[in-house]
């Protein structure tokens, strides 16, 4: 099994990779399967049921909207975010949906989109089942999918096999643990990012890798730029006001940016997460709920570190990807499975290690930075108020971005030797998530979600 950096960093839409990006992909997979098996023309209606965290917080995360767009053939990378809401309202009001854009059928939204708030499927907290029926009401096709975090989707056929979309690509330097990654670095004399580059060559040539990563950086930059200019109230009913644009104006008027670096980092992260909360174009990094941390630290590198350039951006994202794979392989990046430690904690760890890489850190210092970034997010709960990716998510990304820079700086002051390994902290995160009550796993049934009144 192999994971590419482009699996972890994918261009999509907000507000959630597990509740928006994944379900859209799953619904599109279902519709395409109908067409590929020559069943599409016989379909007269479809039904969708969302379970677990998808059912509990799906409305706040835009899951039904994502499913409808996916059934119509849209993908997270290319969907027109400006027209999406109007299209969904048309489906609801007309009672009709066009599968893959060319097969119109009946769809009674109130009856055919079912959210089970307290019922879960056994494999994963983010489960969804889709049915297709013919004109006589006979079942044409039924499929169950699981959105396992970061936009990754597996179907029921993969249950009991691998947790990741299967890929048997042979890598030059395969690794599954931090210890294996460090051993390869010592044996080859390569940096973490250089090892990752060699592995990415299994799918693409170096020019394609570079261009793909710089495209991800361009989308991250555009997201920050939009977030720092747009104002108003975020959707969803909490009446949360955007703050990034006003903060940006104040910081620009207050003098020396170097003296305000940490405030700029916080701003970059909040700008991304305000855009994400509004359903804008973002990059999963490795999830949408934590999408602001890596762009914020990467902006810090480009704007505040002397000598920063696009080569450094490529190395940053490659190193971050290597660390993210360790979390994906050995624990989880899903808030519905392990709490926010799996989302914000993983992103903080990835950003810390990547910053150490571009600051000239050794593989041991990179691993140390990543470990610090995760260690101090252990136990972090996922308790979104109103089921929306707004409170505490937006500010939390800003705090974690600053923490990532601090972790990298701490690691760079040492020689890479430390007591707690990255592997041990990943194992601890997984165990902590298993012990955590379901109330704190993206269900909006505990923590801030029940102590803050929605108004």
From Swiss-Prot:
What pathway is this protein a component of? Carbohydrate biosynthesis; gluconeogenesis
- Which is one Pfam family of this protein? SDH_alpha
Classification via Gene3D superfamilies? D-3-phosphoglycerate dehydrogenase, domain 3 (3.30.1330.90)
Q: Please name the source species.
A: Streptomyces coelicolor (strain ATCC BAA-471 / A3(2) / M145)
Q: Would you tell me the protein name for this molecule?
A: L-serine dehydratase
Say yes or no: keyword Amino-acid biosynthesis present. Answer: no
NCBIfam families, per the entry: sda_mono
Record's family? Belongs to the iron-sulfur dependent L-serine dehydratase family.
Q: Which InterPro entries match?
A: ASB_dom_sf, Fe-S_L-Ser, Fe-S_L-Ser_mono, Ser_deHydtase-like_asu, Ser_deHydtase_bsu
Catalytic reactions on record: L-serine = pyruvate + NH4(+)
Look up keyword Cell membrane and say if it applies.
no
Q: Which cofactors, by name?
A: [4Fe-4S] cluster
Coiled coil (UniProt feature): none
User: GO MF terms on file?
Assistant: 4 iron, 4 sulfur cluster binding; L-serine ammonia-lyase activity; metal ion binding
A GO term (biological process) for this protein?
A: gluconeogenesis
Q: Which UniProt keywords apply?
A: 4Fe-4S, Gluconeogenesis, Iron, Iron-sulfur, Lyase, Metal-binding
Q: What class of enzyme is it?
A: lyase
Fetch the SUPFAM superfamilies from UniProt.
Serine metabolism enzymes domain (SSF143548)
- Enzyme Commission number(s) from the entry: 4.3.1.17
């Amino acid at each position: 099994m192999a994971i590419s950096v482009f699996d972890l960093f994918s261009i999509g839409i907000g507000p959630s990779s597990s509740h928006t990006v994944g379900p859209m992909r799953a619904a599109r997979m279902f519709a395409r399967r109908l067409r590929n098996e020559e069943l599409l023309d016989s379909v007269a209606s479809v039904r969708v049921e969302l379970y677990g965290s998808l059912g509990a917080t799906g409305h706040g995360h835009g899951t039904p909207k994502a499913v409808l767009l996916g059934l119509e053939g849209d993908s997270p990378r290319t969907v027109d975010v400006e027209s999406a809401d109007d299209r969904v309202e048309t489906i609801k009001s007309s009672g009709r949906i066009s599968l893959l854009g060319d097969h119109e059928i009946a769809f009674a939204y109130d009856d055919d989109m079912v959210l089970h708030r307290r019922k879960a499927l056994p494999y994963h907290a983010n489960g969804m089942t889709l049915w297709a029926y013919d004109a006589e009401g006979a079942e044409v096709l039924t499929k169950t999918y699981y959105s396992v975090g970061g936009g990754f989707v597996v179907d029921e056929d993969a249950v009991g096999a691998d947790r990741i979309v299967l890929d048997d690509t042979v890598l030059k330097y395969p690794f599954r643990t931090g210890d294996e990654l460090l051993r390869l670095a010592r044996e080859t004399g390569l940096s973490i990012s250089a090892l990752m580059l060699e592995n990415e060559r299994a799918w693409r040539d170096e020019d394609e890798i570079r261009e793909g990563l710089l495209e991800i950086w361009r989308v991250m930059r555009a997201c920050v730029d939009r977030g720092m200019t747009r104002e108003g109230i975020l959707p969803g009913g909490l009446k949360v006001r955007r703050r990034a644009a006003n903060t940006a104006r104040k910081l620009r008027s207050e003098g020396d940016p170097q003296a305000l670096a940490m405030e700029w980092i916080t701003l970059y992260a909040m700008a991304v997460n305000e855009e994400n909360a509004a359903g804008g174009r973002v990059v999963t990094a490795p999830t949408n709920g934590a999408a602001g941390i890596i762009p914020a630290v990467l902006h810090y590198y480009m704007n505040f570190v002397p000598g920063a350039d696009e080569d450094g951006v490529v190395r940053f994202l490659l190193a971050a990807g290597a660390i993210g794979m360790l979390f994906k392989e050995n624990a989880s990046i899903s808030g519905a499975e392990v709490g926010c430690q799996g989302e914000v904690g993983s992103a903080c760890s990835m950003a810390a290690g990547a910053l150490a890489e571009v600051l000239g850190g050794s593989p041991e210092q990179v691993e140390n930075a990543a470990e610090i970034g995760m260690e101090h997010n252990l136990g972090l709960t996922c308790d979104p108020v109103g089921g929306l990716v707004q409170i505490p998510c937006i500010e939390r990304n800003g705090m974690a971005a600053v923490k990532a820079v601090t972790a990298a700086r701490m690691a760079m002051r040492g020689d890479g030797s430390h007591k707690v390994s990255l592997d041990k902290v990943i194992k601890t995160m997984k165990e902590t998530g298993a012990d955590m009550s379901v109330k704190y796993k993206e269900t909006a049934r505990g923590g801030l979600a029940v102590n803050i009144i929605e108004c």
